[in-house]
């Protein structure tokens, strides 16, 4: 397959290189990724701002690679519309840290994959939990799991308007219990605002601690239990459960 790989951690991130190495063994890979860190960009795109694109050479990789001064969604859009022909699959990742629960709404990684689905290209987002006090993570287990998903999806499930959101826990690969297909959970946090300085503006640093995960059939719960999770996502935010009732009241 022709695979477009992107992310929100930037073209020099360890995760995207590991992913490209794995996918290049069986597929034609092109990387289009942000030139700088763009985590938590959500689905923002560059409007009325020129987008700069530069071809790159990444050590250890033979595939085409481009860095883009813009957002993760810009990268997917440019890859599909300008840089790569006949894309069969978009993969966004491997993200440094989970993209699970309602945190996916903030995620540039997930949004880059959703942008692919908007353009009718099957897409996958892949993320792995990390220890935040270090920057030497081994993403090979996440690459192995997304490779399994790609192999099976290629045979049985490549749908142009669906994103498969995959998360991998940060435990030994042999300790992973398996894969669970599940809904997203609700991510809530206790957020602390720490005052850093006070002049004309008060400058705060936010610190969030996730509240206890509920024991339900969600990605948050299964990740806490040592499973890889997979959730099918769609860009249609319509609340169909409420649609008819709202029609009766407001039309």
Swiss-Prot record:
A single Gene Ontology CC annotation of this entry is: cytoplasm
Can the keyword Hydrolase be found in this entry's annotation? Answer: yes
Q: Please give the cofactor(s) recorded in the UniProt entry for this protein.
A: a divalent metal cation
The subcellular location is:
Cytoplasm
Extract the Pfam families matched here: SurE
**Transmembrane portions of the chain:** none
Listed under catalytic activity are: a ribonucleoside 5'-phosphate + H2O = a ribonucleoside + phosphate
Q: What class of enzyme is it?
A: hydrolase
**UniProt binding sites for a divalent metal cation:** 8-9, 39, 95
One GO MF term on file is: metal ion binding
Point out the coiled-coil segments of this chain.
none
The keyword Hydrolase appears for this protein: yes
What EC identifiers does the entry list? 3.1.3.5
Q: Which domain of life is it from?
A: Bacteria
Keyword annotations for this protein, in alphabetical order, are: Cytoplasm, Hydrolase, Metal-binding, Nucleotide-binding
Record text on cofactor binding: Binds 1 divalent metal cation per subunit.
Q: What does this protein do?
A: Nucleotidase that shows phosphatase activity on nucleoside 5'-monophosphates.
Name the family the entry cites: Belongs to the SurE nucleotidase family.
Name of the featured protein: 5'-nucleotidase SurE
